[in-house]
Amino acid sequence: MKAVTLSFVTFLIARGLSAQPQVYALSGSVSDSATGKPIGAVSVFLDGTSKGTTTHDDGAFFLAGIPAGGYQLIISAIGYANFQTVLNTSQLPSNLHVTLHREATELAAVTVEPDSKNGWNKWGGTFWDYFMGTGDNASSCTIENKDVLRFHYYRKSKRLVVSAGEPLIIINNALGYSIEYRLGAFSYDFSNGQLHFYGSVFFRAMTPTYNGQQRVWESARQRAYLCSVTHFMRSLYQGRIKQEGFFILHQVKKPNTEKERVKAIYDPGIAGTGGISSDSLRYYRKVLREPDYFVHTINNYDTLLTVNADRTRSFSFTGVFTVGYANAQLGIPNTSSSMELTYPASVRIEENGSYSPLQVLLWRGAWAKTETVANYIPNDYTPPPLP
């Protein structure tokens, strides 16, 4: 994403009664960096939420009902480079004004190969399975403007790259959301099965078309939320892992130091020549049959969390976390996922369950299959109380 300058006028309004969660509002304006003129019809939204608005003709906007926490603010207009920045309701800046820059027309030569002809017919199924998913929710979704997708297949590296010049408009009839997804990148490597995609997403709740449809949506949303990474991160933030139905096993690989010691002193050439006692020989051979590493399980995960001054939580770990979830009352069977860090880093969790950096966590198991767009729930979603 192109770099842009930031200078937008923002006012924070905190409101709410003690019996209700505190919410905030954000106001400001957007103008053209070259002319200084206000820009109307600009999309202003908090990434991953249903909180968004558009600017008026005078460039002004007002975004209300923001729950406490940290968010990525996205400001997007056709013909301009997108703007994004991290905001936290506890530390919002004041007296700022956003200026957007005209987007330069860049040649697509960097793709090396031209768009695949009949790209959707050739690669649409692959893209759908890894982007939208393969479950029941995915089968109830449609991409309204799939013609904006561009597919590039690189034969030498066996890699599929997909891009979109406009936000994807996705209708999720299973969960009752209309979604705008601004695709940042999508690539799938057929040689090793490695998938990478990211983007910004904005949700709009759909209007029911028949009696009872809202109840169906609410039930489906609750189920999707309970089985999600967002639910796990919120539970971890609140220290309610067990109460929310999760269990965690933290597995750490530790080297077999005794095997390393025996390797250093054991010489197969003198074994059986009388230079080593039979008891020692049996012991050495037993140790050498052991694995190079032992896996230790750590059940105390509370000590991994650090409370930060801005109300976020941070955690870092080595090894592999196995996360399980089940809810018998709602008919959700046992599922198991694992997560590990792709590089040494600290994962930062917001109160709403969002976390960063996204690319630092590698998921395997259930979440590797279900954390797709068809199962996405807004970060500002509030589930009903569990029975």
What are these regions (language model features)?
Residues T53, A81-L96:
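Structured interaction patches on ligand/partner-binding surfaces of diverse proteins
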Residues T99-P387:
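Surface-exposed, low-complexity/disordered segments
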Residues L26-D32, G59-F61, V98, V110:
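A short, amphipathic beta-strand motif
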Residues L46, I74-V86:
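A short, solvent-exposed loop/turn motif at the edges and junctions
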Residues T49-A60:
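Short, acidic Ser/Thr/Gly-rich low-complexity loop/linker segments typical of extracellular
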